[in-house]
């Protein structure tokens, strides 16, 4: 299986790109949000999700591994394929997806193109009590991709920092005796309304206040 590709953008399409890796062109499917951050001849690192079927071998690429993790997580739900998963990720930031999942907020998922009311309800219902994905942690420094398409050389932190902080807060509340589902909903409400950079201690304190209300 292929987990990561490093190369140069040789061509961009409506829903895919060709990545030149040492002279070999890999055709990689990608969402609109990822493609909008790329330019021809740009050197990039793509986190890859590989789908293998009897009649197809498909690569899907992401600039951030937490997006790849959510792409996989969403497709565990009946009726959600690659197209619907990309539509959700293109419409809703992963931090907002995590909040919507914890709160069972179907309206967030219904914003995605091609996701109707029934599917949005199923997604919200099935994700509500599931732990969100955190992505893979890499021991090497990867380029930092900014939204304007530029690439820096600084190492990045392990993927899914927001998800890891969320899990730490939920774990702390569970250790204090709260039900995991209640803890997830409380943390989601705080992260939705508060500064996403709020210290973990503040998130736990505000979540406790929410649970006591």
From Swiss-Prot:
Coiled coil: none
GO terms for cellular component: cytoplasm; Holliday junction helicase complex; Holliday junction resolvase complex
Region called Domain II, residue ranges: 64-142
Region (Flexible linker): 143-160
Entry's Gene Ontology BP terms: DNA recombination; DNA repair
Localisation: Cytoplasm
Keyword Lipid metabolism carried by entry: no
Main location: cytoplasm
UniProt keyword annotation of DNA-binding present: yes
Keywords from the named record: Cytoplasm, DNA damage, DNA recombination, DNA repair, DNA-binding
InterPro entries, per the entry: DNA_helicase_Holl-junc_RuvA_I (IPR013849), NA-bd_OB-fold (IPR012340), RuvA (IPR000085), RuvA_2-like (IPR010994), RuvA_C (IPR011114), RuvA_C_sf (IPR036267)
Gene Ontology molecular-function annotations: ATP binding; four-way junction DNA binding; four-way junction helicase activity
Function noted in UniProt: The RuvA-RuvB-RuvC complex processes Holliday junction (HJ) DNA during genetic recombination and DNA repair, while the RuvA-RuvB complex plays an important role in the rescue of blocked DNA replication forks via replication fork reversal (RFR). RuvA specifically binds to HJ cruciform DNA, conferring on it an open structure. The RuvB hexamer acts as an ATP-dependent pump, pulling dsDNA into and through the RuvAB complex. HJ branch migration allows RuvC to scan DNA until it finds its consensus sequence, where it cleaves and resolves the cruciform DNA.
Subunit structure: Homotetramer. Forms an RuvA(8)-RuvB(12)-Holliday junction (HJ) complex. HJ DNA is sandwiched between 2 RuvA tetramers; dsDNA enters through RuvA and exits via RuvB. An RuvB hexamer assembles on each DNA strand where it exits the tetramer. Each RuvB hexamer is contacted by two RuvA subunits (via domain III) on 2 adjacent RuvB subunits; this complex drives branch migration. In the full resolvosome a probable DNA-RuvA(4)-RuvB(12)-RuvC(2) complex forms which resolves the HJ.
NCBIfam families associated with the record: ruvA
Domain notes per entry: Has three domains with a flexible linker between the domains II and III and assumes an 'L' shape. Domain III is highly mobile and contacts RuvB.
Entry's family note: Belongs to the RuvA family.
Name of protein: Holliday junction branch migration complex subunit RuvA
This protein's encoding gene: ruvA
């Amino acid at each position: 299986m292929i987990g990561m590709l490093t190369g140069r953008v040789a061509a961009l399409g409506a829903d895919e790109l060709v990545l030149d890796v040492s002279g070999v062109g890999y055709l990689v499917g990608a969402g609109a949000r990822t493609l909008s951050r790329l330019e021809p001849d740009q050197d990039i690192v793509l986190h890859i999700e590989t789908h293998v079927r009897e009649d197809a071998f498909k690569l899907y690429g992401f600039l951030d591994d937490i997006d790849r993790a959510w792409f996989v997580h969403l497709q565990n739900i009946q009726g959600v394929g690659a197209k619907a998963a990309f539509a959700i990720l293109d419409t809703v930031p992963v931090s907002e997806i995590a909040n919507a999942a914890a709160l069972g907020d179907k309206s967030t998922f219904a914003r995605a193109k091609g996701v109707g009311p029934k599917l949005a309800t199923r997604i919200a219902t099935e994700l509500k009590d599931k732990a969100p994905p955190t992505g893979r942690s890499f021991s090497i420094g990867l380029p930092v991709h900014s939204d304007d398409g530029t690439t820096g050389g600084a190492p990045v932190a392990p993927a899914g920092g927001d998800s890891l902080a969320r899990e730490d807060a939920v774990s702390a509340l569970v250790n204090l005796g709260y039900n995991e589902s209640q803890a997830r909903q409380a943390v989601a409400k705080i992260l939705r309304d508060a500064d996403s950079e709020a210290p973990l201690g503040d998130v736990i304190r505000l979540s406790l206040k929410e649970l006591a209300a």
